Structures are given as structure tokens and as C-alpha cells.
Amino acid sequence: MPKTQFQVDQNAVKKALHAAARTYDNVGMVPKAIADRLLERLDFIRLNPLCVVDVGARTGYATQQLEERYREAIVVGLDFSVAILKAASSKMMVGEYTALPFADRSVDLIFSNLAFQWSSDLQQTLQECHRVLKPGGLLLFSTVGPDTLKELHSSFADGHRHVHPFYDMHDIGDMLTQLRFTDPVMDTERLIVHYSSVPQLIKDLKQLGAQNASQDRLKGLMGKTQWRQMLTNYENCREENGALPATVEVIYGHAFGTESNSFKNANGEEVTVPIDKIIRRN
């Protein structure tokens, strides 16, 4: 188990994503840039997948890129927000990250961009990824780390959690090891996004559906005095160019399913599985 465990209000996550369905693509430059970085990593991995699942597909940007990259594969985007999936044009499914609707050892590649931080149980989500991956299949993902929005977090300084909690890279790596993924690799980078004002930052987060959904978040409206104090504190971060920085700590990870030959037929050949056979029936 990870040293730190966060309780995520899944209903709050779904509500925020539902509200962001119409605005997500308008402000999704950072998620798209990170998706592009993650997709580039596939250039260095030899993989000819028959089945690809994009977990946390949102409006389908990465799903479309995966379809173009792997034209012979079945590519499915999955998310738990019905509303946000309606904005997508690719093949999409509604499903929970903690109970992936796919059969055991049926998926060659699980791709996930900036989604795992919204899982109600990250360890269970990774366990589900391990379950559905074919032996030797690839899990490739990005998420965000605890330094994300550190300027906003420190500007409140009132003892309450105003920023969604994020797992440390090492905790995620430990989970992958404990779940017996093969050759897990983790790395991180920090991106700085600049804003003219804090209200603009808050607006962008809301339009992305990226709001604090921790169970121990302070519920109810914030007082005017508290809000003004936070704005004053954040002003201390303003840079010489006049911009306010917002840090995004991006965590990248990949690992492989446990090796075995059980997914090949008697002739040692890969078997193509129809999509209706891949989906798990309860």
C-alpha cells in the first residue's frame, strides 16, 4: 500500500467533468501538450497492438491519435463522464477506472493521459490495468504530482485543503512494483503555465473539470476576506514579466504486464479478439 492514501469524492469528479463537457477543448492546451509528449514515447517502444484502450479519454484527442498510429488495432476510449464523451468522435465507452469493463488479459496497450489523479482508488485502478493487460502488454500513463498548483496551495495558508491532493511519483512506482508489473519506469517534469490573474487560473481549472474533489476539502462558499487574502498572497509569486505562475508537476510512467505465452494460439500467433469478446460481462 502507498504511504499516503487520498480519499476522492467520485461524485464531485463526475459533476465537475459533466459541467466542463462544453468547455474542455477550449482550454485544454496543457492536457493536449502532455498527451503529445506521452504519445511521442511510443516511438521508442516496439509494439504492434491488436487492442488499445485510452483510459480517461475525455473528448478523445489522444484516442484519435492512437487510431491513426495503430490503424489495424481496435482502439477504444473510456471515461466515466457520459457528458464529456459525447463531445468525442471516436469509439467510446463509459466505465469506471476501478472496474475496467474488459476481459482478463485482453488489451495490448493501456494509454492514460492525466486521468489517474481522479481515480477514487489509484491502487485498484492500477490493479485493474494489470488484470486486463495481456502478458507483455504496455501501460503508458501521465498524471500530476504534489507540486502541481503549489502556488495556489501555499497562497491559502489557512490549514484547509483547497487544492486536490496528488500522489508522489515514488508512491505510484511502489504501487506498480507491488502489483507485479514488469520493468516499471517513472520520471517527472515541471511545466509552468502563466496567467494574468488568479481568477483566470480558477476559471481555466473549472472549464477543465479540474477542481478539488478530495473528501476532506472545505465545503461551502469561501468568505470574501479569505479570498482577498489568497489573492494578496498569490501576488507575491508574480514574476518580472508581470505573469503569475502555476506549476504543473507532470509524472510519466510505463510498465508491462507479467510475461507469459498464454495469449498466443497453438501456432504461437497473436489472436485477434472481437470487441464484443473483449468487453467483460458481469
Swiss-Prot record:
| Gene3D superfamilies recorded | Vaccinia Virus protein VP39
What reaction gets catalysed by this protein? malonyl-[ACP] + S-adenosyl-L-methionine = malonyl-[ACP] methyl ester + S-adenosyl-L-homocysteine
What pathway does this protein act in?
A: Cofactor biosynthesis; biotin biosynthesis
- Top enzyme class, one word, equals transferase
What domain of life does the native source organism fall in?
Bacteria
Q: Which Gene Ontology BP annotations are present?
A: biotin biosynthetic process; methylation
CDD domains tied to this protein: AdoMet_MTases
Q: Which InterPro entries match?
A: BioC, Malonyl-ACP_OMT, Methyltransf_11, SAM-dependent_MTases_sf
Q: What is its EC number?
A: 2.1.1.197
Task: Tell me yes or no: is Transferase among this UniProt entry's keywords.
Answer: yes
Q: Which GO terms describe its molecular function?
A: carboxyl-O-methyltransferase activity; malonyl-CoA methyltransferase activity; S-adenosylmethionine-dependent methyltransferase activity
Keywords assigned by UniProt, alphabetized: Biotin biosynthesis, Methyltransferase, S-adenosyl-L-methionine, Transferase
Please tell me whether the keyword S-adenosyl-L-methionine is annotated for this protein: yes
What HAMAP family has UniProt attached to this entry? BioC
Function in brief: Converts the free carboxyl group of a malonyl-thioester to its methyl ester by transfer of a methyl group from S-adenosyl-L-methionine (SAM). It allows to synthesize pimeloyl-ACP via the fatty acid synthetic pathway.
Family per UniProt? Answer: Belongs to the methyltransferase superfamily.
Protein name according to UniProt: Malonyl-[acyl-carrier protein] O-methyltransferase 1
Q: Which gene encodes it?
A: bioC1
